[in-house]
From Swiss-Prot:
UniProt xrefs under Pfam families: DUF2462
Compositionally biased region (Basic and acidic residues): 29-46
Family in the record: Belongs to the UPF0390 family.
Name by which UniProt lists this protein: UPF0390 protein CND04920
Domain of life the protein comes from: Eukaryota
Compositional bias annotation for Polar residues: 48-57
InterPro entries noted in UniProt: UPF0390
Native organism: Cryptococcus neoformans var. neoformans serotype D (strain JEC21 / ATCC MYA-565)
Sequence segments annotated as region (Disordered): 1-57, 75-97
Coiled-coil annotated residue ranges, if any: none
Amino acid sequence: MAQGAGKSIKAKGKSGGSQRKNTGKTKPGKREVAPKDRQRVLERSQKKQLSSKINNSIEKQMVQAASVGKLSIMRNVGELESGEGKDGKAKGKGKSR
């Protein structure tokens, strides 16, 4: 060919310095060793179930409070039931817009 063969372009890789930086670093986060004792395994599973139930109930309460009105997540449920917080004109609380 008159023009010559096309150049083979290599993909640019990481530089040697950035490759060396990440070696030897441990990943962030908590490390736990799985229990081997039967009693401890049961305790761990029970703790996991309880924490998931608590989180689910909190999420349900947040959704329920959010469906009632604007900023109702930040207010007490008692205020919402009495009707103070529905129209945004609570007695002396917060800014009126």
